[in-house]
Design a protein with these regions (language model features):
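Acidic/polar, glycine-enriched structural segments that form the non-catalytic walls/loops
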Residues: 1-73, 94, 98, 105-111, ...
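Hydrophobic alpha-helical transmembrane segments
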Residues: 79-80
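Helix-terminus loop motifs that line ligand-binding clefts
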Residues: 56-66, 76, 92-174
Length: 174
C-alpha cells in the first residue's frame, strides 16, 4: 500500500487518524494554553503506546534490561493500570478503559484478588513477593492492587453509565 499511495500520504493518513482519535470526545480545554492543550492530546497518545490490544495496561515497553539478565517492566500491575484507566475515563477514552476492565476480569483470582503482576496475555508474571513467610503460606498480594481496580471501575461506570458493559463483569470482577 505504501508503494501505491506513497509514504507522504500514508504518514498524513496516520497522523490524521491519531489526531482524530485523541480528540474524539469534546473536552473543554479553553482554560489551558494552546501548548498545554497539545500536551493533553499527546499524553493520550503516549498512554496508548503502553496499552496492549488485549486490554493490559503495561508499565513500560522496555526490553533492553533483559540483555543484562534482569527482568523488564513489560507487565501489567493492576494498581498502576487502574490509575491509567481512570485517566482514560477522564479523557473520554471509554473503549480503552473497558478493555482494561475486561482484561482484569480474566486475571482476577477465584477468591477475588489480584496477584502482583501479569503478562499482557493475562498470565501470572514473575514476582518478588514471597508465597511463604516464616514457614507460613501467605498471599503475595498488595490490597491496593485489587481495590484500585474496583475504584477505577466505579469511576468508569459513574462517568459513562454503561450498564450493558458492567453487567457481564459483575460476578467475575465485582
Amino acid at each position: 500500500r505504501v508503494n501505491e499511495s506513497g509514504p507522504d500520504n500514508m504518514l498524513h493518513r496516520t497522523e490524521s487518524y491519531w489526531r482524530l482519535w485523541a480528540r474524539k470526545e469534546p473536552i473543554d480545554l479553553s482554560p489551558l494554553s494552546a501548548g498545554v492543550g497539545e500536551l493533553f492530546y499527546r499524553s493520550q497518545l503516549v498512554l496508548r503506546t503502553q496499552i496492549d490490544n488485549g486490554g493490559a495496561i503495561i508499565a513500560a515497553n522496555d526490553s533492553d534490561i533483559t540483555q543484562f539478565g534482569g527482568d523488564h517492566y513489560s507487565y501489567c500491575w493492576t494498581r498502576d493500570g487502574a490509575l491509567v484507566a481512570y485517566a482514560l475515563t477522564l479523557c473520554g477514552q471509554s473503549e480503552l478503559s473497558r478493555n482494561y476492565f475486561r482484561y482484569c476480569a480474566e486475571c482476577v483470582e477465584p477468591d477475588g484478588y489480584f496477584l502482583h503482576k501479569y503478562t499482557p496475555t493475562g498470565d501470572l508474571a514473575s514476582s518478588w513477593h514471597p508465597w511463604m513467610l516464616d514457614g507460613l503460606k501467605i498471599l503475595p498480594i498488595q490490597q491496593d492492587e485489587t481495590s484500585l481496580v474496583l475504584w477505577a471501575l466505579r469511576k468508569h461506570f459513574t462517568t459513562f453509565r454503561d450498564v450493558e458493559f458492567i453487567k457481564p463483569l459483575f460476578n467475575s470482577l465485582i
